[in-house]
């Protein structure tokens, strides 16, 4: 999982990527290609 300051490019990497808020942090999850997971600082 990458830790990024901006998730703008992370959500555009794959069409299945979606943004989720969990416990005050913003995550990008991708079910079909899990290597595109990311978290915002």
UniProtKB/Swiss-Prot annotation:
Record InterPro entries: Ribosomal_bL36, Ribosomal_bL36_sp, Ribosomal_L36_bact
Keywords: Ribonucleoprotein, Ribosomal protein
GO terms, molecular function: structural constituent of ribosome
Keyword S-adenosyl-L-methionine set for record: no
PROSITE patterns per UniProt: RIBOSOMAL_L36
Cellular component terms (Gene Ontology): ribonucleoprotein complex; ribosome
Gene Ontology annotations of biological process type: translation
Family note: Belongs to the bacterial ribosomal protein bL36 family.
PANTHER family the record matches: 50S RIBOSOMAL PROTEIN L36 2 (PTHR47781), LARGE RIBOSOMAL SUBUNIT PROTEIN BL36B (PTHR47781:SF1)
Protein name according to UniProt: Large ribosomal subunit protein bL36B
